[in-house]
């Protein structure tokens, strides 16, 4: 086989491998994102809790819930460099 054909086959194989690997990672990410809400995303105590032990804060009538860190946690994360 000529070097050009070998290079083309190597390139196609590499692209196929990377595409399969990317699809696996994407499905893992999507599944974990469904399970909890990140900071400043909507949340619900029963169906969609907040990630990383962040509090789910709601308005006084129990609607418009959002994941928010408290002031102590915000300062702690800032100090740690997160």
Swiss-Prot record:
Q: What keywords are annotated for this sequence in UniProt?
A: Disulfide bond, Knottin, Secreted, Signal, Toxin
Q: Which InterPro entries match?
A: Spidertoxin
Cysteines paired by S-S bonds: 36-51, 43-56, 50-67, 58-65
**Where is it chiefly localized?**
secreted
UniProt propeptide residues: 23-34
Q: Which residues form a coiled coil?
A: none
Write the signal peptide boundaries: 1-22
Q: Name one GO molecular function term.
A: toxin activity
User: Domain of life here?
Assistant: Eukaryota
Q: Does the keyword Signal apply?
A: yes
Mention any one GO cellular component term assigned to this protein in its UniProt record. extracellular region
Subcellular localization? Secreted
Q: In which tissues is it expressed?
A: Expressed by the venom gland.
Family statement drawn from the similarity comment of this UniProt entry:
Belongs to the neurotoxin 02 (plectoxin) family. 04 (U16-lycotoxin) subfamily.
Domain comment text?
The presence of a 'disulfide through disulfide knot' structurally defines this protein as a knottin.
> What protein name is recorded for this chain?
U16-lycotoxin-Ls1a
């Amino acid at each position: 086989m000529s070097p050009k054909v070998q290079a083309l086959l190597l390139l196609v194989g590499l692209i196929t491998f990377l595409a399969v690997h990317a699809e696996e990672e994407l499905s893992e990410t999507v599944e974990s994102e469904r399970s909890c809400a990140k900071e400043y995303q909507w949340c619900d105590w029963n169906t969609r809790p907040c990630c990383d032990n962040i509090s789910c804060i709601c308005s006084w009538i129990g609607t418009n819930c959002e994941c928010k860190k408290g002031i102590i946690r915000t300062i702690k994360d800032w100090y740690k460099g997160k």
